[in-house]
């Protein structure tokens, strides 16, 4: 009978389409859920879980049925079957390791999230309720506290100073509660470190004003500091600036000087994420007096005045300061120092970050991400933007009024996923000239230099040499100096003899008119001025940028909260739900959004729409500037082929050059490359990414929350030291900055990294850019602490130790950075731990402890080294019935795990008697306990236990010994243990047969043992004498079984070929043998796959010990194809076989097809043995053998056993790569390509092969 035949006979039931039955079933369940929800709702209903769809995995408290009712009452969805595309949250209290890997990247949440959200009356953040996270088993995520007190210190240098007049005790006591200040934390300013963004606590304004969707509008009054205002106190405290540098370094490491700091840390433990509120009143007053005709609001310090840098004027805020500032602001401005010229100044760090645009960009991204999260937490399900669209779209409402008057979407068609990418056009330029109509239509650039594009040449600087160095490094990929003569004769590298050079100020953004002339973002202003002498320079206006970015996100939030904050000028929005509700087309909705953004911000935005994030971004490229483009699904193939590979995310200069060397320039060229070839060239992850992206495939979801992986702070501008003490003091100051950032995020770090940029030997001492780092070498040192910390003194001490080991020339230092990794939460809340029901046993005295608790305690106490020395482990599995909650002890099986060296812990811990436990057995038992035999218990560990715990374990061992002697005299009935609870009539259950009497003495599963030739003699000799005797007896028994099996096989008729395998015969075998003989190869050995199919004793005897599936497969092969016998005869023939009496036909009249097998091998260990024998004994694989392996892999895909498929593929890859014959690598590529094609067609994805 061919596989799938039983399905084909049922094709005429109305669901001919593949997967149509399940799709219809799921749709019916969803409709049933909606109808039940309409009947269940009463006065206590709400829309807290609107847009949330849960899937319950396993036992939970509340139960799955209770959670279903809660989702009905509160506007959520409950999925009986998990869907990766539809299910938003998975609810579970415990998952096996295989499930954790399978659900990697999904939101696995504890049920307390639902219960506590209902209690709170709003949707809480799921991060504190995650069951597992990517970082570690103890990290639950970031927790932010929106409460702050006036006396708390600042979290970072970009915030306003602790004191207004540089006096410690001068603190404002009364803060008006009409406004709240948005937390403005710190993060690395490095543009490349986007994943290290840090979230900000978003506090709402409570003052009257226009709001959208419950969120205050920023135009009434600005209550959020943008962070560009520098503080009077930087990373160094005021008293540190008044003492000599030597005393400063020593004092900060001494215990006496840290008492006040410890007190301050203790007092601010619960309010780390807060920014200063002392200037709140003054900020509100100055904002109210803003001049509406200017883009900037006011200037708080002389830092915003024009200052000569590199021969050009540098300004942060355009125009003069407001003359109507309050007295408090004026006092603060006078107290603020000027721009520091040395890193030893007190406020150097804070001033650096306040002027760094890259720091502001990363800070705004974190702030906007938290803004979106706050919107989701406080959502009431009402969106003003949608209501406006519904009124515009008259006669095409998506809502259908049912007979009962309820509003529902039952009859609405299911829309395909639709992602919208919104990107502002030339963001910095558009904001800078929105109130300057004279500059519109002209080439404009945002930069710090507003001069002629030239700066005076400083003595010792050699700009031409640096230019040649970087050009050579980028274009040719060489890191060496292009011409050694340039180092010896610096003057020869000068472009000309003039006393001025081109300005090195970078262009942050340029208009499209400037881009048409060859100017690009990131270009030096001097070079851009040469290309376009009429280029107009516009200064930075951080306050205006932030205001427009906030307006952009508020506009999007009026339609939906499913937003991913990409940057201050860029966002991804999932508009699938909006289109379904409003019945608008994607183009109509995009046009409405663009018009509203333009009205609110006076800036234009481009919109791209696609079925996934990749296509939406590509569509935006075509839509720019000031346009929109909808990439329809039917247009994707033609559109994607013509796209350059550089348009794909993740493809930079290096990868572009590597692809060009392969003759690939477009995505169409890339589509001709197989995944195996791409993974070989670029690695498994990058190869798979390129394979999918070039076909327009992208399954990345719109993410609103991201976990923080590191905290860092780097400065590579203005770093010039003359003495070691200055460098040490700066490291301590940067450590204090790291402490503030860690405290602001509520995290501690364990791994510390110090990065130093040192001038390259021979490079000019004076850099081409004033204060820049020039040509440098990067040096890094890393240390891992015993415990995670956020203390500046501990971090600073570690930094100084690593710094001293570098033995650097202090004057050559050009950059310093500190990175903290391996983050853990500062406070672990015990209430967030998964709650589990207590398991107590009435069979033991002092029932407050269970056997599970005993082994969990012992497991926690064992070190890693001891775990590697353990040969056997006790597998304790407790399952509590949610109905009875009773504990029933069963007579245990002899439980010993195999000693195979290639059996890992994950395999061992999930097996029972060396075999996988049937799920049906576990589900019908209230409690099943396995404890090791008395010979396996460590007596020293047993004696260290508490008396009552030790007594419990001893009693269990005594019961085991008594039952093992009793089992020798009494055989189990039909292979089933008498301790199993009775079941209702008609229950289909596969039982594991009791071991034979000859096996009961040894307690070893002989099938699971490795070959005796594979046992390491040294390991065997190190085992206890009793265990050695058991293993020898087990091997003797297996040898006797093999002899008996061989004898019975020779006497019986030949077994017919497996009817499930329809493979080709060997092609031109004689010709290939002849070719081999000319080379002098040995005689061809018959394939082990054929030998295994016909001669394996373990597979031909249906009575052999093994798993139920093995018994079934052996029986089916022994009896012949099931179609040749009537079902009655088949049922009668199985009645005498242990463990097979329950094998019945299904209601459709078909026998269940056998499990996928490779020449009869079903279990993974048997498959591994067969593959190893095949690859190591055959030099040239036959085509039919390769096709047999391909069919086995595709059968695994059909049975949805992808975990075993992954193990088989990886094991074959390791074996075939070790072979010296190149034909094996070709065979593996052929197998993998076929498997990936089937996976792609079945699941829409491929297997990651590392």
Curated annotation (Swiss-Prot):
<dbReference type="InterPro" id="IPR043502">
    <property type="entry name" value="DNA/RNA_pol_sf"/>
</dbReference>
<dbReference type="InterPro" id="IPR001126">
    <property type="entry name" value="UmuC"/>
</dbReference>
<keyword id="KW-0479">Metal-binding</keyword>
<dbReference type="InterPro" id="IPR012112">
    <property type="entry name" value="REV1"/>
</dbReference>
<feature type="binding site">
    <location>
        <position position="570"/>
    </location>
    <ligand>
        <name>Mg(2+) 1</name>
    </ligand>
</feature>
<feature type="region of interest" description="Disordered">
    <location>
        <begin position="204"/>
        <end position="236"/>
    </location>
</feature>
<dbReference type="InterPro" id="IPR038401">
    <property type="entry name" value="Rev1_C_sf"/>
</dbReference>
<feature type="compositionally biased region" description="Basic residues">
    <location>
        <begin position="1069"/>
        <end position="1078"/>
    </location>
</feature>
<keyword id="KW-0237">DNA synthesis</keyword>
<feature type="binding site">
    <location>
        <position position="569"/>
    </location>
    <ligand>
        <name>dCTP</name>
    </ligand>
</feature>
<dbReference type="Pfam" id="PF00533">
    <property type="entry name" value="BRCT"/>
</dbReference>
<feature type="region of interest" description="Disordered">
    <location>
        <begin position="252"/>
        <end position="329"/>
    </location>
</feature>
<feature type="compositionally biased region" description="Basic and acidic residues">
    <location>
        <begin position="260"/>
        <end position="273"/>
    </location>
</feature>
<keyword id="KW-0808">Transferase</keyword>
<keyword id="KW-0548">Nucleotidyltransferase</keyword>
<feature type="binding site">
    <location>
        <position position="569"/>
    </location>
    <ligand>
        <name>Mg(2+) 1</name>
    </ligand>
</feature>
<comment type="subunit">
    <text>Monomer. Interacts with the DNA polymerase zeta which is composed of REV3L and MAD2L2; the interaction with MAD2L2 is direct and requires that REV3L is in its closed conformation. Interacts with POLH, POLI and POLK. Interacts with FAAP20.</text>
</comment>
<dbReference type="InterPro" id="IPR053848">
    <property type="entry name" value="IMS_HHH_1"/>
</dbReference>
<feature type="domain" description="UmuC">
    <location>
        <begin position="419"/>
        <end position="652"/>
    </location>
</feature>
<feature type="region of interest" description="Protein interaction domain; mediates interaction with DNA polymerase zeta">
    <location>
        <begin position="1151"/>
        <end position="1250"/>
    </location>
</feature>
<dbReference type="InterPro" id="IPR001357">
    <property type="entry name" value="BRCT_dom"/>
</dbReference>
<dbReference type="Pfam" id="PF16727">
    <property type="entry name" value="REV1_C"/>
</dbReference>
<feature type="binding site">
    <location>
        <begin position="423"/>
        <end position="427"/>
    </location>
    <ligand>
        <name>dCTP</name>
    </ligand>
</feature>
<feature type="binding site">
    <location>
        <position position="357"/>
    </location>
    <ligand>
        <name>dCTP</name>
    </ligand>
</feature>
<protein>
    <recommendedName>
        <fullName>DNA repair protein REV1</fullName>
        <ecNumber>2.7.7.-</ecNumber>
    </recommendedName>
</protein>
<dbReference type="InterPro" id="IPR025527">
    <property type="entry name" value="HUWE1/Rev1_UBM"/>
</dbReference>
<feature type="compositionally biased region" description="Basic and acidic residues">
    <location>
        <begin position="1117"/>
        <end position="1128"/>
    </location>
</feature>
<feature type="region of interest" description="Interaction with target DNA">
    <location>
        <begin position="652"/>
        <end position="655"/>
    </location>
</feature>
<keyword id="KW-0460">Magnesium</keyword>
<dbReference type="GO" id="GO:0017125">
    <property type="term" value="F:deoxycytidyl transferase activity"/>
</dbReference>
<comment type="similarity">
    <text>Belongs to the DNA polymerase type-Y family.</text>
</comment>
<dbReference type="GO" id="GO:0003887">
    <property type="term" value="F:DNA-directed DNA polymerase activity"/>
</dbReference>
<dbReference type="InterPro" id="IPR031991">
    <property type="entry name" value="Rev1_C"/>
</dbReference>
<keyword id="KW-0539">Nucleus</keyword>
<dbReference type="Pfam" id="PF21999">
    <property type="entry name" value="IMS_HHH_1"/>
</dbReference>
<feature type="binding site">
    <location>
        <position position="423"/>
    </location>
    <ligand>
        <name>Mg(2+) 2</name>
    </ligand>
</feature>
<dbReference type="GO" id="GO:0070987">
    <property type="term" value="P:error-free translesion synthesis"/>
</dbReference>
<feature type="compositionally biased region" description="Polar residues">
    <location>
        <begin position="1046"/>
        <end position="1055"/>
    </location>
</feature>
<dbReference type="GO" id="GO:0003684">
    <property type="term" value="F:damaged DNA binding"/>
</dbReference>
<dbReference type="Pfam" id="PF11799">
    <property type="entry name" value="IMS_C"/>
</dbReference>
<dbReference type="GO" id="GO:0046872">
    <property type="term" value="F:metal ion binding"/>
</dbReference>
<dbReference type="InterPro" id="IPR043128">
    <property type="entry name" value="Rev_trsase/Diguanyl_cyclase"/>
</dbReference>
């Amino acid at each position: 009978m061919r596989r799938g035949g039983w399905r084909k006979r049922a094709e005429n039931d109305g669901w001919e389409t593949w997967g149509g039955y399940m799709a219809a079933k799921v749709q019916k369940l969803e409709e049933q859920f909606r109808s039940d929800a309409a009947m269940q709702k009463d006065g206590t209903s709400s829309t807290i879980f609107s847009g949330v769809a849960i899937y319950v995995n396993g036992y939970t408290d509340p139960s799955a049925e209770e959670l279903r009712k809660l989702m009905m009452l509160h506007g959520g969805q409950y999925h009986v079957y998990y869907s990766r595309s539809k299910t938003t949250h998975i609810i579970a209290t415990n998952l096996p390791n295989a499930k954790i890997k399978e659900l990697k990247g999904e939101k696995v949440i504890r049920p307390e999230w639902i219960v506590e959200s209902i209690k709170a009356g709003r949707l809480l953040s799921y991060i504190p309720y995650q069951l597992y996270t990517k970082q570690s088993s103890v990290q639950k995520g970031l927790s932010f506290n929106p409460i702050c007190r006036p006396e708390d210190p600042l979290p970072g240098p970009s915030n306003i100073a602790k004191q207004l007049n540089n006096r410690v005790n001068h603190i404002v006591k009364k803060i008006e509660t009409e406004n709240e200040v948005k937390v403005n934390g710190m993060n690395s300013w490095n543009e490349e470190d986007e994943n290290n963004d840090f979230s900000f606590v978003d506090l709402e304004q409570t003052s009257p004003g226009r709001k959208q969707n419950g969120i205050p509008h920023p135009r009434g009054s600005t209550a959020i500091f943008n962070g560009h205002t520098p503080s009077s106190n930087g990373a160094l405290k005021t008293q540190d600036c008044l003492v000599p540098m030597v005393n400063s370094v020593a004092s900060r490491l001494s215990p006496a000087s840290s008492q006040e700091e410890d007190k301050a840390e203790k007092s601010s433990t619960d309010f780390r994420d807060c920014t200063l509120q002392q200037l709140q009143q003054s900020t509100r007053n100055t904002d109210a007096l803003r001049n509406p005709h200017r883009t900037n609001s006011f200037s708080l310090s002389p830092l915003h005045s024009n200052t000569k840098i590199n021969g050009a004027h540098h300004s942060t805020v355009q125009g003069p300061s407001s003359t109507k500032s309050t007295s408090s602001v004026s006092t603060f401005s006078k107290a603020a120092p000027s721009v520091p010229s040395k890193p030893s100044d007190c406020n150097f760090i804070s001033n650096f970050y306040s002027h760094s645009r890259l720091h502001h960009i990363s800070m705004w991204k974190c702030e906007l991400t938290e803004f979106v999260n706050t919107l989701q937490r406080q959502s009431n399900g009402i969106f003003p933007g949608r209501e406006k669209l519904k009124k515009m779209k008259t006669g095409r409402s998506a809502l259908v009024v049912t007979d009962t008057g309820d509003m529902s979407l039952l009859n609405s068609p299911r829309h395909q996923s639709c992602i919208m990418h919104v990107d502002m056009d030339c963001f910095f330029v558009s904001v800078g000239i929105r109130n300057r109509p004279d500059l519109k239509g002209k080439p404009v650039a945002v930069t710090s230099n507003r001069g002629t594009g030239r700066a005076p040449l400083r003595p010792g600087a050699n700009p031409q040499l640096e230019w040649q160095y970087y050009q050579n490094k980028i274009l040719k990929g060489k890191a060496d100096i292009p011409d050694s003569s340039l180092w010896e004769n610096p003057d020869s590298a000068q472009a000309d003899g003039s006393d001025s050079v081109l300005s090195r100020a970078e262009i942050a953004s340029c208009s499209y008119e400037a881009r048409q002339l060859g100017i690009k973002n990131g270009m030096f202003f001097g070079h851009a001025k040469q290309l376009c002498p009429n280029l107009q320079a516009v200064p930075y206006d951080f306050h205006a940028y932030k205001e427009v970015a906030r307006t952009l996100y508020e506009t999007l939030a009026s339609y939906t909260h499913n937003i991913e904050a990409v940057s201050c000028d860029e966002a991804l929005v999932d508009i699938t739900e909006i289109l379904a509700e409003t019945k608008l087309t994607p183009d109509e909705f995009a046009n409405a959004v663009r018009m509203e953004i333009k009205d609110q911000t006076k800036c234009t935005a481009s919109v791209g729409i696609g079925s996934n994030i990749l296509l939406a971004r590509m569509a935006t490229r075509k839509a720019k500037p000031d346009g929109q483009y909808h990439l329809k699904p039917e247009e994707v193939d033609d559109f994607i082929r013509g796209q350059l590979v550089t348009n794909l995310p993740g493809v930079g200069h290096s990868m572009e050059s590597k692809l060009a060397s392969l003759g690939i320039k477009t995505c169409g060229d890339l589509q001709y490359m197989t995944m195996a070839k791409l993974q070989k060239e670029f690695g498994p992850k990058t190869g798979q990414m390129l394979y999918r992206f070039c076909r327009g495939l992208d399954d990345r979801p719109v993410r609103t929350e991201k976990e923080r992986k590191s905290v860092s702070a780097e400065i590579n501008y203005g770093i010039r030291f003359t003495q070691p003490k200055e460098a040490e003091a700066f490291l301590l100051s940067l450590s204090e900055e790291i402490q503030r950032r860690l405290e602001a995020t509520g995290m501690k770090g364990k791994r510390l990294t110090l990065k130093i940029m040192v001038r390259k030997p021979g490079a000019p001492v004076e850099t081409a850019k004033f204060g820049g780092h020039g040509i440098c070498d990067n040096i890094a040192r890393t240390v891992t602490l015993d415990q995670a910390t956020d203390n500046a003194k501990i971090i600073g001490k570690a930094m100084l130790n690593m710094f001293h080991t570098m033995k650097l020339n202090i004057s050559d230092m050009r950059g310093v950075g500190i990175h903290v990794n391996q983050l853990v939460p500062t406070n672990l809340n015990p209430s967030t731990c998964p709650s589990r029901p207590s398991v107590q046993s009435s069979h033991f005295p002092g029932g407050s402890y269970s056997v599970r608790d005993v082994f969990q305690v012992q497991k926690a106490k064992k070190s890693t080294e001891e775990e590697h020395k353990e040969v056997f482990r006790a597998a304790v599995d407790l399952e509590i019935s949610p109905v009875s909650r009773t504990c029933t002890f069963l007579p245990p099986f002899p439980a010993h795990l195999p000693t195979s060296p290639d059996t890992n812990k994950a395999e061992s811990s999930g097996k029972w008697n060396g075999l996988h436990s049937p799920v049906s057995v576990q589900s019908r038992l209230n409690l099943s306990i396995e404890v090791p035999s008395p010979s396996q218990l460590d007596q020293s560990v047993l004696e260290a236990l508490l008396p009552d715990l030790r007594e419990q374990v001893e009693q269990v061992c005594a019961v085991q010994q008594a039952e093992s002697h009793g089992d020798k005299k009494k055989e189990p009935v039909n292979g089933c243990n008498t301790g199993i609870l009775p079941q209702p009539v008609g229950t289909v259950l596969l039982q594991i047969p009791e071991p034979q009497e000859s096996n009961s003495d040894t307690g070893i599963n002989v099938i699971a043992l490795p070959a005796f030739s594979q046992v390491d003699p040294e390991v065997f000799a190190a085992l206890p004498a009793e265990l050695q005797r058991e293993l020898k007896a087990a091997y003797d028994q297996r040898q006797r079984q093999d002899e008996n099996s061989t004898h019975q096989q020779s006497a019986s008729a030949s077994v017919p070929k497996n009817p499930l395998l329809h493979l080709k015969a060997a092609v031109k075998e004689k010709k290939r043998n002849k070719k081999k003989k000319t080379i002098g190869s040995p005689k061809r050995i018959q394939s082990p796959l054929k030998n295994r199919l016909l001669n394996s004793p373990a597979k031909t005897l249906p009575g052999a010990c093994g798993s139920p599936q093995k018994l079934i497969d052996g029986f089916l092969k022994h009896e012949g194809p099931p179609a040749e016998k009537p079902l009655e005869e088949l049922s009668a023939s199985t009645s005498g076989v242990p463990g097979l009496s329950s094998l019945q036909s299904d209601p459709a009249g078909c026998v269940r097809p056998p499990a996928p097998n490779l020449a009869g091998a079903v279990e993974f260990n048997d498959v591994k043995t067969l593959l190893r024998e095949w690859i190591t004994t055959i030099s040239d694989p036959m085509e039919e053998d390769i096709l047999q392996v391909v069919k086995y892999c595709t059968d695994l895909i059909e049975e949805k056993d992808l975990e075993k498929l992954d193990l088989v593929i990886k094991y074959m890859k390791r074996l075939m790569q070790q072979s010296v014959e190149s034909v094996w690598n070709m065979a593996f590529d052929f197998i993998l390509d076929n498997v990936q094609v089937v996976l792609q067609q079945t699941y829409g994805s491929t297997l990651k092969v590392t």
